[in-house]
Amino acid sequence: MSRRDDTKADPIYRNRLVNMLVNRILKHGKKSLAYRILYNAMMNIRRETKYNPLFILRQAIRQVTPNVTIETRRVGGSTYRVPTEIESTQGKALAIRWLLEASRKRPGRNIASKSSSELMDAAENSGNAIRKREETHRMAEANRAFAHLR
């Protein structure tokens, strides 16, 4: 009996993706602060783009989601970086993690403005999270010869 897909929807947007993002923003159990950060970021997106922020969020996560990832395998004393395909849920989780990591590294005053600008950049296929996905795909392409070691 799998309990994995038991993600609840958030109270305002009624969306599971928003709740997944809030749970990744969460630090030290302060969920209300995480919600406030994300909702402020969504308001910034609505103010700057005049689009539905949920649409921008979905588009950003879709753009950042990787198809393959690199795993390290040890075969006969040597280590190989083996490209492996990943499921959509794992890819989505990676995309959320990369988006938040890129927004935390971004210069700016508060995390809400940094994450809103990173989400808008990712929706337009630019930004550090997109760079991370392209780097992972490039690495997988370079190590395609070791794909048989899966």
Swiss-Prot record:
It is found in: Plastid, Chloroplast. One of its GO terms (cellular component) is small ribosomal subunit. The keyword rRNA-binding applies. The keyword RNA-binding applies. GO terms for molecular function: rRNA binding; structural constituent of ribosome. One of its GO terms (biological process) is translation. PROSITE patterns: RIBOSOMAL_S7. Keywords: Chloroplast, Plastid, Ribonucleoprotein, Ribosomal protein, RNA-binding, rRNA-binding. Its main location: plastid. Belongs to the universal ribosomal protein uS7 family. One of the primary rRNA binding proteins, it binds directly to 16S rRNA where it nucleates assembly of the head domain of the 30S subunit. Part of the 30S ribosomal subunit. HAMAP family: Ribosomal_uS7_B (MF_00480_B). NCBIfam families: rpsG_bact (TIGR01029). This is Small ribosomal subunit protein uS7c.
